[in-house]
Amino acid sequence: MEEGITRIGVSLPKNLLDEFDRIISTRGYSSRSEAIRDAIRTYITEYRWLESEKGEIVGVLVVLYDHHVKGVSDLLIDLQHDFHEIITSSTHIHLNEDQCLEMILVKGKMERIKVLVDKISAARGVMNVKLISAVKKV
């Protein structure tokens, strides 16, 4: 159980807040604060899992990004070439006129895959990055 409550302020784009409020209503949260605490706990759990994985894995890196952001498409291509030893293939999907989804199949040492995840996550224009570990190599 958490100790005490600390009040913080967060700036969000209106469309992101509207979508969050819609989800809060659908899921039955009593407040934004409760939903934000839940989202932060989920993020921390996923981060800890990513940090704890070791050894060789096979998985898919799912990247959602806004292709209108200058340089993001080129950066993703450059990173795929820079990490060619762990990337077996990739698929590019046009979701709408603004957003693209890149599915990158990875196979290799988790430590190296984490570096790729961090570089993609930090890129301006990238909206979401998710690593799904399909198989742990033996």
Curated annotation (Swiss-Prot):
It comes from the Archaea. InterPro entries: Acetolactate_synth/TF_NikR_C (IPR027271), ACT-like_dom_sf (IPR045865), Arc_rbn_hlx_hlx (IPR013321), CopG (IPR002145), CopG/NikR_regulator (IPR050192), Ni_resp_reg_NikR (IPR022988), Ribbon_hlx_hlx (IPR010985), TF_NikR_Ni-bd_C (IPR014864). GO terms for biological process: response to nickel cation. Ni(2+) binds at residues 81, 92, 94, 100. Pfam families: NikR_C, RHH_1. Keywords: DNA-binding, Metal-binding, Nickel, Transcription, Transcription regulation. Signal peptide: none annotated. Binds 1 nickel ion per subunit. Its cofactor is Ni(2+). SUPFAM superfamilies: ACT-like, Ribbon-helix-helix. One of its GO terms (molecular function) is DNA binding. Belongs to the transcriptional regulatory CopG/NikR family. HAMAP family: NikR. Homotetramer. Transcriptional regulator. This is Putative nickel-responsive regulator. It comes from Archaeoglobus fulgidus (strain ATCC 49558 / DSM 4304 / JCM 9628 / NBRC 100126 / VC-16). The lineage of its organism: Archaea, Methanobacteriati, Methanobacteriota, Archaeoglobi, Archaeoglobales.
